Amino acid sequence: MMRINARTVPFLATLGVFILLYALCAVQYPAMLSSRVIANLLTDNAFLGVLAVGMTFVILSGGIDLSVGAVMGFTTVALAVMIEGAGLHPLASFTIMLVAGALFGCGIGAAIHWLKAPPFIVTLTAMFLARGAALLLSTDSIPVRHDFYQTVSGLSLTLPGGGRLGLIALLMLLAFVAGGVLLHFTRVGLKIYALGGNARFAGLMGIDTARTTILVYGVSSTMAALAGIIFSLYTRSGYALTGVGVELDAIAAVVIGGTLLSGGVGGMAGSLIGVLIQGLILTWITFDGSLSSWWTKIAIGMLLFIFIGLQRLILQFSAPTGRTG
């Protein structure tokens, strides 16, 4: 008889919840099974998915990153200023922001490691810095009218049934695949899991915890910058207040996806499903038409509470027990 590893239970529960919700929604609204709706579900949640990729790295390492929403907002407004104000080509602007995001994240990781400061405090500080910098650039929404944006918006992969999977959705899926490969098939991934499992023991095992911590937050901020690029392409504008509170949505997606808040357990597949659950609930409410979109937050809060409780039970039952006698 095959035994199920207790640490895979959160992921299996997440998968079961998604399948059940999708089935119930499809029974009520058969159009949910169309490739158009599926493509829209992926496209509309592409920026959140990319944020969840970076957040998965951070939470797996035992940390937290509250700055990703602000970095995303700063990226959108900085892109608009560079493209519309300075006349830079979008590709050059994208490159600048990805590098800036990586450097910003590495600075966060370095501060956390060398100052021995809690990730919550350091990333909260980084959130204020990034949001303040965005507001210094502009307090208004800046439209981006470059022809490149128009061209990119027309790029898509046609699915059976007529659905069109946009470039930004493909970028999100590529980010999840790349993140999964890095976590599960490289030594870097092993170091991240070890750091999240027990940072002290990871250091005793010879793992460079400083480099790993810096890498993790560098990846997170790079993904936040990429999310800003995706959102800029999606809305064709830049706004300093973009992404307010979205870091909490990313954390919720990762935790609902089965990654333990304490670190060391989880994966990319679960985070993707966590993102899709959030998108599915919002789509269901939109189809219904009689409910406020704020019900999405209530539903996600309830799911988050349930999954955190499930995590506590798993940690309790999987913890080694002492023997007497």
Regions found by a protein language model. Give the residues of each.
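Transmembrane alpha-helical segments in multi-pass inner-membrane proteins
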Residues: A224, Y234-G301
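Single transmembrane alpha-helix segments in multi-pass membrane proteins
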Residues: L21-P30, S35-A86, A110-K116, V254-M268, ...
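Alpha-helical transmembrane segments within multi-pass membrane transporters and channels
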Residues: G87-M127, I273-G274, Q278
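Structural signal for alpha-helical transmembrane segments and their membrane-water exit/capping regions
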Residues: V17-L33, S61, L135-S138, G179-R187
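Cytosolic-side transmembrane-helix boundaries in multi-pass membrane proteins
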Residues: M1-A23, V27, G197, L204-R211, ...
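Transmembrane helix-bundle core of multi-pass membrane transporters
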Residues: N5, P119-V188, T212-L215, T235-G243, ...
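Helix-loop-helix "hairpin" substructures at the membrane interface of multi-pass membrane proteins
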Residues: H89-M97, L103-I108, L159-G238
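Hydrophobic alpha-helical segments embedded in the membrane of multi-pass proteins
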Residues: N45-G54, A70-F74, L103-C106, T125-F128, ...
